[in-house]
Amino acid sequence: MKKFLTAFLVAFTGLFLVACQNTKTENNASNEANTTLTLKVGTAPNYKPFNFKQDSKLTGFDTDLIEEIAKKNGIEIVWVETNFDGLIPALKSGKIDMIASAMSATDERRQSVDFTKPYYMSKNLYLKLKNNDSLQTKNDLEGKKIGVQLGTLQENTAKAIKNAQVQSNKDLNIAVLALKNNKIDAIVADQDTAKGFLAENPELVSFYQETDGGEGFSFAFDKNKQKDIIEIFNKGIDEAKTDGFYDTLIKKYELE
């Protein structure tokens, strides 16, 4: 009887341990299946065609590219809207995990953030009223009033013009309105964004174009904290260019 009881207890204990191990394995597998990387992505939704609102929905070149890369890598994206000049502070404070907002990679910005490889190259385009014959080149802007978007490379470009009176705006639409009302003389903006304003405002024309001084638009992450994620997006940018998705976006948003 004693031998039988001992054998029973040994067998029961073995079955119990196996059951526990199976349950633990199933729970781990379930947890792994339910674990999804979530990234809070900051953007300034007033920079058409890269980031803007259409029927109250966030859209644009950057938005579509981020969503495509995220979908292929099982990443959930939570969009966080803010002003352009507030994006890096939001990144540094942990309110967002990355920036996707037509941000140019520069040495100054690299002091506080890391960038992916560039996904788009752009230029500066200068706008004026069609009936303003006094502005023909960049040199004609000396001492003039120039509208720009706050925190952009174009703001730095305008400030470098001799005696220029630079008006920095959180939204370029404000600058366009000021130009149409003769409160400023010109606007300096990213060429693709500027072309959108030209299409919507026939009284405006471009009169000068130049490189923007940056290395191209890139996605930004907090300094030395997201190396693995940066590699995912670098690979995603390459894949988008080889599988045709990138060209689809270029045509969709009428970019060069």
From Swiss-Prot:
<keyword id="KW-0564">Palmitate</keyword>
<keyword id="KW-0029">Amino-acid transport</keyword>
<keyword id="KW-1003">Cell membrane</keyword>
<dbReference type="InterPro" id="IPR001638">
    <property type="entry name" value="Solute-binding_3/MltF_N"/>
</dbReference>
<keyword id="KW-0732">Signal</keyword>
<dbReference type="GO" id="GO:0005886">
    <property type="term" value="C:plasma membrane"/>
</dbReference>
<feature type="lipid moiety-binding region" description="N-palmitoyl cysteine">
    <location>
        <position position="20"/>
    </location>
</feature>
<feature type="lipid moiety-binding region" description="S-diacylglycerol cysteine">
    <location>
        <position position="20"/>
    </location>
</feature>
<feature type="signal peptide">
    <location>
        <begin position="1"/>
        <end position="19"/>
    </location>
</feature>
<comment type="function">
    <text>Involved in histidine transport.</text>
</comment>
<comment type="similarity">
    <text>Belongs to the bacterial solute-binding protein 3 family.</text>
</comment>
<dbReference type="GO" id="GO:0006865">
    <property type="term" value="P:amino acid transport"/>
</dbReference>
<dbReference type="Pfam" id="PF00497">
    <property type="entry name" value="SBP_bac_3"/>
</dbReference>
<keyword id="KW-0449">Lipoprotein</keyword>
<keyword id="KW-0472">Membrane</keyword>
<keyword id="KW-0813">Transport</keyword>
<protein>
    <recommendedName>
        <fullName>Probable histidine-binding protein</fullName>
    </recommendedName>
</protein>
<dbReference type="InterPro" id="IPR018313">
    <property type="entry name" value="SBP_3_CS"/>
</dbReference>
